[in-house]
A protein has these predicted regions:
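Active-site entrance/lid segments in N-terminal catalytic domains of soluble metabolic enzymes
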Residues: 1-202
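Conserved active-site-proximal phosphate/metal-binding subdomains
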Residues: 174-208, 213-343
């Protein structure tokens, strides 16, 4: 079986960066360059996702839709309350009212799966958890390839057992949320290429891989390790078409103030790699595993930081290759990364 991301002229996938970063314009530019585009379905209702998918259909016949698969983590209410209390002075300083009663949601997952079954697309990928065999079967029945994001060999084995068609292997150096099915585990640093080799030794499925990509050489390393395509997110954050906020863009280009990244649960309650700023330094130690409750708790603060242009309170998602992100058209960036590996 040939997976959709194996058919594009260039073996580059534009990462589905939820929350407005992966815009329709960014996806279109990735497709125009010969890469594989995604519609980022995270944080959207089915009604909001629908027009983005239909717009993508007008741009490219080959594309994917990414969803957040529910992965409930038992909430430690006392730890949550301690974190909320620690945030109160900062919230008061910025005139923000915190959502101190824990909010739970499934990101409209069932409704989005229902919509994708009724309006089939070439490929659907899942992150944050593995799809159930039932969901795999429903999407297969309408001709959709199902891809699971995995971060360990164990997750890869389980995904294969559930019948997925391919894997996206996310290394620990990737920016933004880890797609791990176990967000409570400690995520150890390692090259993504090593993880790809380990998984391919155990699982016979096509693989796309990403995490820590800082240029064309890194793309080549992942392809040499056995990946069919390479997922790029951080290197597209400064693209003209990306929805990256102004303070996020400024921080990415300020190597003196924002020189390192780290995995933190402080913004959302789920491990995510970000540029280390004041918020991370102050609250990482008291943060807890409680997604989406912490996401909702800090949402108002992050919105205020974005509106006021303050990068020190903002979730500055970035992988370890962030220093090599440059402004320009996404089409040019994708071609620079993938042209030498054209199929």
């Amino acid at each position: 079986m040939t997976i959709a991301f194996e058919t594009t002229p260039l073996p580059i996938i534009g990462a589905p960066m939820a929350g407005g970063t992966t815009t329709p314009e960014l996806s279109a530019a990735v497709a125009a360059a010969g890469g594989f585009p995604f519609v980022a379905g995270g944080y959207l209702t089915a009604e909001a996702l629908a027009p983005l998918v239909e717009r993508m259909r007008e741009t490219s016949e080959t594309f994917g839709v990414n969803l957040f698969a529910p992965n409930p983590v038992p909430l430690d209410r006392a730890a949550f309350d301690r974190f909320a209390t620690a945030l109160e002075p900062l919230a008061a300083e910025h005139g923000v009212t915190l959502e101190t009663e824990p909010v739970d949601d499934d990101d409209h997952y069932d409704a989005k799966v229902d919509w994708l079954v009724a309006h089939p697309v070439p490929l659907v990928s899942m992150t944050f958890n593995l799809p159930t065999a039932e969901v795999v079967d429903r999407l297969h029945a309408v001709g959709t390839h199902l891809v699971a994001t995995v971060t360990t060999v164990g997750e890869a084995r389980e995904a294969a057992a559930r019948g997925v068609d391919a894997l996206i292997v996310q290394g620990p150096r990737a920016g933004g949320h880890s797609g791990t099915a176990d967000p409570t585990r400690e995520i150890e640093d390692r090259p993504t290429a090593d993880l790809v080799r380990e998984i391919l030794a155990e699982v016979d499925l096509p693989i796309a891989a990403g995490g820590g990509v800082d240029g064309a050489e890194a793309v080549g390393e992942l392809l040499d390790a056995g990946a069919s395509a390479v997922v790029v997110g951080t290197l597209l954050l400064l693209a003209d078409e990306a929805g990256t906020s102004a303070p996020h863009r400024a921080a990415l280009q300020d190597a003196e103030k924002y020189s390192e990244t780290g995995l933190t649960r402080a913004f959302t309650g789920r491990p995510a790699r970000a540029l280390v700023n004041d918020f991370v330094r102050e609250f990482d130690e008291v943060a807890l595993d409680a997604y989406p409750a912490v996401h909702h708790l800090t949402k108002g603060l992050r919105a205020e930081a974005k509106a006021s242009g303050d990068p020190n309170l903002l979730h500055l998602w970035a992988g370890t290759g962030h220093r090599w992100a440059v402004p320009g058209s996404a089409e040019t960036i994708v071609k620079q990364l993938g042209t030498r590996f054209a199929r």
